[in-house]
Amino acid sequence: MTDSLDDRIRRLLDRDEELLASPWQLFDDVREASAPAFYSEAMGAWVITSHRLLHQILVDPATWSNCSPTATYEFRNPVAEHAHAIEKESEMAEAVRRFRNRSRGRVLNTADPPEHVRQRRALNRAFRPDRLRALQPEVASVSESLVAAFAPRGRADLVQEYAVLLPMVMISRMLGVPEDELAVFKGWSDDFAIPIGRARPSRDEVRSYIKSEYEFDEYFSVLVEQRQAEPRDDLISDVANAEVDGEPLTHEERMGALRQFLLAGNETTTTLLGNIGHRLATDRGLRDRLAADRDLVPAFVEEALRHEGPVTGLFRVATRDTDLGGEPVAEGEFAWLAFAAANRDPELCPVPHEFDIARHPNDHVAFGYGEHYCIGQGLARLEATVGANAMLDLPNLVLARDHRDAFMDSYILRGRTRLLVGFDPITALG
């Protein structure tokens, strides 16, 4: 018996390994069955695979709220239920209390206008173009040092030895925190991702999530106070002293922004770099073409974002009765914006499943669109471009014989957790 579309969506929600690795046929089938939108009982949301409809939602924040981008209310309930039980543990009571207070606030990717507009105005300067241009030599230097550690071996796990570390080192330097605590920051970041795309996290996972948020807030609250008294040229200082029309951000807005900078500043770029590495290790013709003409690398990065971006989909909730291409949608109903599917919509581009760096224009939505266009997209593109060039410098790059694909345990984020490769050993760089 063939599974229904909703059965297959339920399998995706349950993080079926086959669907996490390759959701493309499911998305094509949903698109074909949609007229023009498909309501999934399993997800409790309209599944949006159309680039046109997704764009329509993204440019209308008054109708489509971003208050719960990573889960419907139903899927948030298990986290709340576990939190209620965890609160009875004496050592976790204060952490849970703060968690509840944070959950009531909305910052950046959970905020809507006018709050979101005010927050973005205050924080946009943190990722201003001149700062990113000045970072390019530093990103290249960090990249070279990471490659130097494994280049003589002729073998590496490009995810764990490169894709994880490059964005983690860079966001730590931009924040202005000690690099000798990278493991702590990475642990926090990984825990922050626990509720993202796991419909039913365990109690232990929720405990780790709440504990890490508490520890993060304790640590960064001290640094924010220090930067208010003695500002530096770093992200913490930007956040600590940000104002709009003379009004400073609230403490929760500062902490929320810093948490999101840490998470988005490494998790999504790590997945992008891993996908780039896999493409280069499996497509020799493309690799040779890029190696011969490095001016093509930016277009390669854009096609990597379209073809296999780091975010599979995010939720929006209707603030009033509306419609999706003629399908009535009631106030309070959710829509799951499948960015990965919209980027392969045949209406957007011909032969969408082919990887083609000559696509122009490449109107992908890997970084979103409109009000919530990714604030850190410039940094991600910079790191991806440097990373792609570094991988092109690995002679005869191929997948290792013992490589087996493994993907993140999430239906929201999609990326490899390892990438074993081989190449001709390099004894000296530069």
What is the predicted role of each segment?
Residues 1-159, 171-186, 190-203, 207-211:
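Active-site substrate-recognition loop segments, prototypically the cytochrome P450 B′-helix/B-C loop
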Residues 27, 381-430:
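Cytochrome P450 proximal C-terminal region
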Residues 24, 291-327:
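Conserved cytochrome P450 K-helix E-x-x-R motif and the immediately C-terminal K′/meander segment
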Residues 128, 134, 210-270:
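Conserved cytochrome P450 catalytic core segment spanning the I/J/K helices
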Residues 254-260, 266-289, 375-395:
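Cytochrome P450 catalytic-core helices
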Residues 340-362:
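Conserved cytochrome P450 K-helix/beta-meander segment immediately N-terminal to the heme-binding cysteine loop
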